[in-house]
Amino acid sequence: MDAFPIPAESFILGFIGAGKMAESIVKGVAKSGVLPPDRICTAVHSNLKRRDAFESIGVKVLSDNNAVVEYSDVVVFSVKPQVVKDVAMQIRPLLSRKKLLVSVAAGVKLKDLQFWVAEKKKLYFVQEWTGHSRFIRVMPNTPSAVGEAATVMSLGGTATEEDGELIGKLFGSVGKIWRADEKLFDAITGLSGSGPAYIFLAIEALADGGVAAGLPRELALGLASQTVLGAASMVTKSGKHPGQLKDDVASPGGTTIAGIHELEKSGFRGILMNAVVAAAKRSRELS
């Protein structure tokens, strides 16, 4: 099948769905300079706050999803998973192999997208599924709102390496992006997809501990959140294993090793591991 390269210097990026995730991605892309906002579009039906949010960035707001598909070279599904099927079948007549479809909808597999936008044709008495098959599945997480997403993508169908590089550049503007086989996405959901909530809980618990030890609430929360941010930066920037970084600050008989001892007695590692495994299991059940 012939490949139709996406024109890097002129392509239009369209979002089906104008929620918070789409907004955070658009802001990151526009702020990074990867793509000017006047080459990004979405559709807002009646929500004036959503319209204002996108127009304030400089994004073109169109009348409906069909207009977005017709206008765009790269179409991003950023809607709730339960409505992806209906939207995909609605826009199916407007698709061509020149368009790249990207889904950020949780739990929606590449094979599902391909099935929903395919056309069933009878050829020599044999039923064949034909039509659009140029897809990339992307899983960002909520820190995309502040440009610190942990994102994973998987190429499907006839998506090319060039398509992957393009999407990597776009989503890399709101954090870091990796490529992985789609079969790993349930585990990825359990780790990076649900992970921010685990860390929010940890920050809250650290702050509560600070309050219990006598700190004012505002100071405790500020120290807890900055400590988590700084520790994460040390892991990513130092290249050291987190275990080594932990050992570096755990002096014999000191305060840190006393705190670590309490965490280990309470099964801290196992609790986090079990949370990831449980969320991954639930993701498999829902998909």
Task: Give the ranges of each region predicted by the language model.
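NAD(P)-dependent Rossmann-like dehydrogenase/reductase catalytic/cofactor-binding core
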Residues: D2-E9, S225-S287
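Short acidic capping loops at alpha-helix termini that bridge into adjacent secondary structure
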Residues: P36-I40, R97-K99, R134, E218
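Small-residue helix-packing motif on alpha-helices
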Residues: I40, V68, V84, P216-L223, ...
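Internal alpha-helical scaffold of NAD(P)-dependent oxidoreductase catalytic cores
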Residues: D112, W116-R134, A150-A187, F200-K237, ...
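Short pre-catalytic strand/loop immediately N-terminal to key active-site residues, enriched for Gly-Thr
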Residues: F11, F135-I136, F185-G190, P242-D247
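Rossmann-like NAD(P)(H) cofactor-binding subdomain of soluble oxidoreductases
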Residues: I57, N65-F77, P81-M153
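NAD(P)+-binding Rossmann beta1-loop-alpha1 motif at the extreme N-terminus of oxidoreductases
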Residues: M1-Y71, E148-A149, V211-A213
